[in-house]
Amino acid sequence: RRQRQMCIRDRLPGDITGINVYDRQKNEFTLRKGPVFTNILLADELNRATPRTQAGLLECMEERQVTIEGVSYTPGEPFFVIATENPIESAGVFPLPEAQLDRFLIKLSMNLPTKEEELRILELYMEEDPLKSLTAVVSLEELLAARAEAAKIFVHPCIREYMVQIAEATRRADGILAGVSPRGTLGLLRCVKAYAYLQGRSYVIPDDVRTLAVPVLAHRLVCS
């Protein structure tokens, strides 16, 4: 299952998580689930939502649960949040707080396509929207099984020491007010194991750490 939520200024936290509504026929309140009750949530232009609404995602992103009026609910399993944001110089945006940025596993920047890539895009759209013909390449069960196998990937103590050294270096570096938190180091561990699994290896190598350190850690730094 997937959901897309367009984030705008008048969006409320309940629009993301869900609310209890009164059912006159049953004479009781029932839960109207929000977009977080899914497997993949696309939060489009997240930094256009107000800080209060952005905070509505924090609990479900970190704890995999949603609390509505004191009652905790579990979203989908697995649960992923993919967010896009406008450039910070755009009008009407709210910078994401450090606590929320730290909950995103990876941050990628989307650059403009090359000439060849743009020509390929035009070719794909010559007849019909290619998105309409997309088919699933993996089932939910296969995805969960792959995640379980990736968790078994071996990480030598030297590799773990290497990752901690990188994190500690960010905490001591001049010009950085806040370095990588332990959550960031754990995120790097998860990513390098998954990367090694996708490369067909049962173990992590130093190049895996070097490949993923920037996309996993850079957005967590607070620079002066």
Where are these regions (language model features)?
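Short, small-residue-biased leader/transition segments that mark boundaries at the very start
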Residues: 3-8
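Conserved alpha-helical scaffold flanking the Walker A/P-loop in AAA+ ATPase domains
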Residues: 22-42
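Glycine-rich phosphate-binding P-loop
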Residues: 1-2, 48
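Canonical AAA+ ATPase core
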Residues: 23-28, 49-53, 61-153, 193-195
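Conserved P-loop NTPase mechanochemical-coupling segment
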Residues: 11-15
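Conserved AAA+ ATPase small/helical "lid" subdomain
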Residues: 133-185
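C-terminal engagement/docking regions of AAA+ P-loop ATPases
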Residues: 170-224
